[in-house]
Amino acid sequence: MSNNEFLNKLGEQAKKASYALASLTGQQKTALLRCIASKLTDAKANIIAANQQDVEQAKANGLSEAMIDRLLLDEPRLLSVIADIDNVIGLTDPVGSEIDSRLLDNGLRLSRRRVPLGVIGVIYEARPNVTVDIAVLALKTGNAVILRGGKETLASNKALCKVIRSAMAEQGLPEDCVQLIDNPDRSLVSGLLKLDKYVDMIVPRGGQNLQRLCAEQATIPVILGGIGICHLFVDVQADLDKAVAVIENAKVQRPTVCNALDTVLVHQTNAASFIPALCQQLATKGVSFYGCAQTQAVMANNEQQIMQATDESYSTEWLSLTLGIKVVGSLEEAVAHIRQYSSGHSESILTDNIHTASEFMNAVDSAAVYVNASTRFTDGGEFGLGAEVAVSTQKLHARGPMGLEALTTYKWLAWGDYTVRG
């Protein structure tokens, strides 16, 4: 079977399965998700063993620590993934809800109702937790899904999908509601992007190269995002003692994810006192620094080395314990820097001045903008959405963390009384 024939078969099966999903009641979907959670718990040892194969292979292939951290699915992370299923079960199912309705002058009673998108294709890299997150959100909203994970997590993804598909069968549903492309041939990605006869939306979760490939080749609507060049501005009226803790959380807690902090902008009034204190604390956590000339000047007599920041470094999503630092003279300069280098993901300001905070929130055009909070909150779970499909940095059809509602569309329903148009 050729790749094209394989993909068409996959798409046809997914489309057929989506019709069965679309007719499920909320109770049936809840039973399915509970079954998946139970089976994942029972298969915990097998899943972790499969993931360990991926980790060992990644180490043998010389992959970076950041990449290995991304693909790791140990017991705490797996239990967190399973807990997220329970969170999704508790969320309101948007499918079938009425958005609005009205009686028209022509006699029609018109309403908009939320319905599943149909079939979703998700292309992602070294994160096996995405396999479960996506499948659960898709099933909750009545969508079939075609998954194409990275070759680095092939064993993990196969183990996870086997469990999910067994739950589908146990609940009397088509296993093809969730399908995995387990062939690492990259041409299959290009083929999936053109499977518009069957697939309704593509969600790429990966780096710039994957995002660019999807944007250039897809004949299907694509949700772009997941690249997080995130900024935090320490205003002249910030509480500097509290600011260090927020920045440490944003940078250090989990540096390999897209909502981790990349660049700190510091008002020049506080630079001489704040930057040395910040660098001293973060250095104890293994953070290295790129800084502007003013940053290097205020750190000249300190032991922490500050490498010269460049356009390239400011344009980098570090995904590691590396932080850019830039001194700015005003809120306007901070906003200008963010507008130039941000990926549109998450930005934050630390300030006790409510007017400055409001100006920042109005001026910065990113998916999530914070006042006195870490950028790490940009997450479906933290936003109360349950697990997320992705974090969209575009403005159509979804923006920011994509939860259940982002996996639906609507259709117009019109009731008449043998009504004709005049």
From Swiss-Prot:
Give its E.C. classification number: 1.2.1.41
Q: Which reaction does it catalyse?
A: L-glutamate 5-semialdehyde + phosphate + NADP(+) = L-glutamyl 5-phosphate + NADPH + H(+)
- Top enzyme class, one word, equals oxidoreductase
**GO molecular function: any one?**
NADP binding
Subcellular location field: Cytoplasm
> Could you tell me the keywords of this UniProt record?
Amino-acid biosynthesis, Cytoplasm, NADP, Oxidoreductase, Proline biosynthesis
> What Gene Ontology terms for biological process does this UniProt record contain?
L-proline biosynthetic process
Return the SUPFAM superfamilies for the record. Answer: ALDH-like
Keyword Repressor attributed: no
UniProt xrefs under Pfam families: Aldedh
* Top-level taxonomic group: Bacteria
Q: In which pathway does it act?
A: Amino-acid biosynthesis; L-proline biosynthesis; L-glutamate 5-semialdehyde from L-glutamate: step 2/2
The Gene Ontology CC terms held by the record are: cytoplasm
Task: Tell me the function of this protein.
Answer: Catalyzes the NADPH-dependent reduction of L-glutamate 5-phosphate into L-glutamate 5-semialdehyde and phosphate. The product spontaneously undergoes cyclization to form 1-pyrroline-5-carboxylate.
Q: Which family does it belong to?
A: Belongs to the gamma-glutamyl phosphate reductase family.
List, alphabetically, the PANTHER family matched.
DELTA-1-PYRROLINE-5-CARBOXYLATE SYNTHASE, GLUTAMATE SEMIALDEHYDE DEHYDROGENASE
Q: Which protein, by its recorded name, is this?
A: Gamma-glutamyl phosphate reductase
Q: Give the organism's phylogenetic lineage.
A: Bacteria, Pseudomonadati, Pseudomonadota, Gammaproteobacteria, Alteromonadales
Its encoding gene is what?
A: proA
